[in-house]
């Protein structure tokens, strides 16, 4: 039976703005309070989805969240009609309104951790929504994330869904941005690679000093248990705390893996040799041949990696076994990074081609190609059980671009977030979107 890696990309929501909400994310902080263009952001994301679909890759779409999140503001003490809640928040606590309007759910690499059926004890695909408890604006995402994933992957014969881990710092979980799976074939048992920034309970592990480590070892271990993964199929590694302090807030900013290949920066991990040996040994026992490509700091610095998002790329396997790297335009703008990529593809190695995409609206908030997608490895029968409304096709692309053109503003500033009309625009758009994607009622305004 054939198996596929399906990339489900996050559709950018109508309230995409530069709120500067993500401490430790250099791009998010440095572009704070600039004017944004939600329409352009959504169309840039859709263009990437269409391009991958046309290249022959399986591509899906993940719906955005309801924003402003009026229920979240009510939980913080604002009362009255929805319009009054928004106006009160704007007057009394603008940062809370900005947080409740964040379109950060577009970065669906943080939506959940996914384990394919070949790895799990019960032979189903397992999903655990990430609690994202490190940042308030993201911690409010997981209830809707769970409902959307449940509507996309509804068949309980094939799919199992777990609630987010306890929303406390000890179980800080950032989802697939700190998780990669290595395998010989997507349908065969593989090795799941969990990367953490600190341990909550074991003081022997070092931690960053400047920026927070968002993923704990204990959270990764809990997800592996929930998914029924075997010890032989799991490797845990610690991200280098010094790179977290340089703006590497998720592992997908400093490494990317796919199939049998890990592409990583020399400074990405602690105890790298031990980690590589464990990956090689465990994948070898599952019939795979683990290979790694290390980018030396002498050629690309950590700062270059963070500015260009070289590693926040998509590493994709072509039918002929060669690999393709999808990178943001910013890689071409960095001389050292671009020079490295040219030498990489001309060396006759595993990565043969680089494709560049303009994702500037997302990049200015600190999210590149890898942030925008959630990978789900599916067997043919499982893919057939996915809600067909969320699988990208040429007609769906056309419908979604028209939908964006109809509902999205082309300019949004912080003061616009206080406009109650924006809430109505967003709800109207999302109500239509759930019909387009055949999701049913998943948003609070549709349920309550």
UniProtKB/Swiss-Prot annotation:
Signal peptide: none annotated. Belongs to the succinylarginine dihydrolase family. Keywords: Arginine metabolism, Hydrolase. It comes from Pseudomonas fluorescens (strain ATCC BAA-477 / NRRL B-23932 / Pf-5). It comes from the Bacteria. GO terms for biological process: arginine catabolic process to glutamate; arginine catabolic process to succinate. This is N-succinylarginine dihydrolase. Catalyzes the hydrolysis of N(2)-succinylarginine into N(2)-succinylornithine, ammonia and CO(2). One of its GO terms (molecular function) is N-succinylarginine dihydrolase activity. It catalyses: N(2)-succinyl-L-arginine + 2 H2O + 2 H(+) = N(2)-succinyl-L-ornithine + 2 NH4(+) + CO2.
